[in-house]
UniProtKB/Swiss-Prot annotation:
PANTHER family: CHLOROPLAST PROCESSING PEPTIDASE, SIGNAL PEPTIDASE I. The chain crosses the membrane at residues 7-27, 64-84. One of its GO terms (molecular function) is serine-type endopeptidase activity. This is Signal peptidase I. Belongs to the peptidase S26 family. Keywords: Cell membrane, Hydrolase, Membrane, Protease, Transmembrane, Transmembrane helix. The gene is lepB. GO terms for biological process: signal peptide processing. It holds the Pfam family Peptidase_S26. The active site is at S88, K142. It comes from Buchnera aphidicola subsp. Schizaphis graminum (strain Sg).
Length: 312
């Protein structure tokens, strides 16, 4: 969908730009013809033709060129708006948040193929990044947890991570990041648990609701809140197994990144499908510019003014 809109903007900008150039050429011709003082009826005829050209339908279209051009430049190279469709980044980002993504955070990229034209900064640990999924090309948003060369270990029961930086096949982790977790506190977020009402027609009803616990995760000096569900774990076979590595341990390859959602038990991320190549990065999420009170697949019921601002 995003690529379709980009192609539409590019095509519209090009088409209206051509009409805009033609229109201005005709205006210039008209200006010089009007300056000429001649008794030749041909001049009058030419002026009439030019006046008719000015009233042509394409002149109305050509007037849209500046708008298409500005929107295309801003959206492709400066800031692009995105909507948060799911709860995988709760509590940092909620369903109904509309965010701005800084497109030039990690370089200037060609808007259609996403190939880097000018390379700039590299992603930092803790950045919230929009990227293309490495397999299905869908836009995702997650937090950068692992950088190239990191060894990531995930504790499936305690819901905690260990990170060894600049790992080069050593048996013991010599450069381990200092990671701490606060005591879990009950949050206002909950997940509905469904029970089959009838196995014949597969009707469902709400059986119970489990509230998430909020934990502050601090990686060196970077801290953010995450959500966990006590007593609920994914099957170990659901996790991505890197070639030559045991389950739940990954070594981040060169020019790739390990992404995780802040809603740890409701996020399909690098733990399940692997690493994100650098060329798939679209930009860094920086601000919430609008936030609607809504649930997934439902209409908004209000506006969350207090959520508008910077993203951390």
């Amino acid at each position: 969908m995003r690529n379709i809109l980009t192609i539409f903007l590019l095509t519209s900008t090009f088409f209206t730009g051509i009409l805009w150039i033609i229109d201005h050429i005709l205006l210039i011709k008209n200006y010089f013809y009007n300056k000429k003082k001649t008794k030749n009826n041909n001049t009058i005829l030419i002026n009439k033709v030019i006046l008719e050209n000015k009233k042509c339908f394409f002149r109305s279209l050509s007037s849209l060129f500046p708008t298409f051009f500005i929107v295309f430049i801003i959206r492709s190279f400066i800031y692009e708006p995105f909507q948060i469709p799911s709860g995988s980044m709760m509590p940092t980002l909620l369903i109904g948040d509309f965010i701005l993504v800084k497109k030039f955070s990690y370089g200037i990229k060609e808007p259609i193929t996403n190939k880097t034209i000018i390379k700039m900064n590299l992603p930092q640990r803790g950045d919230i990044v929009v990227f293309k999924h490495p397999k299905n090309n869908i836009d995702y948003i997650k937090r950068v947890v692992g950088l190239p060369g990191d060894k990531i270990q995930y504790d499936i029961n305690r819901k905690k991570i260990k990170i060894c930086i600049n790992y080069t096949n050593q048996k013991n982790c010599e450069n381990k990041l200092f990671i701490t977790y606060s005591k879990p506190k009950l949050s206002n977020f909950f997940q509905k648990i469904y029970l089959l009402k009838s196995r014949t027609n597969e009707e469902e009803k709400v059986y119970n609701s489990i509230y998430f616990k909020k934990v502050e995760e601090k990686i060196n000096n970077l801290k953010h809140n995450i959500l966990i569900l006590d007593g609920i774990n994914s099957k170990i076979n659901d996790y991505y197994q890197q070639k030559g590595m045991p389950k739940l341990i990954w070594i981040v390859p060169k020019n790739k990144y390990f992404m995780m959602g802040d809603n740890r038990d409701n996020s399909l991320d690098s733990r399940y499908w692997g690493f994100v190549p650098e060329e798939n990065l679209l930009g860094k999420a920086t601000k919430i510019w609008m936030s609607f009170e809504k649930k997934e697949n439902e209409w908004p019921t209000g506006i969350r003014i207090k959520r508008i601002g910077n993203i951390y």
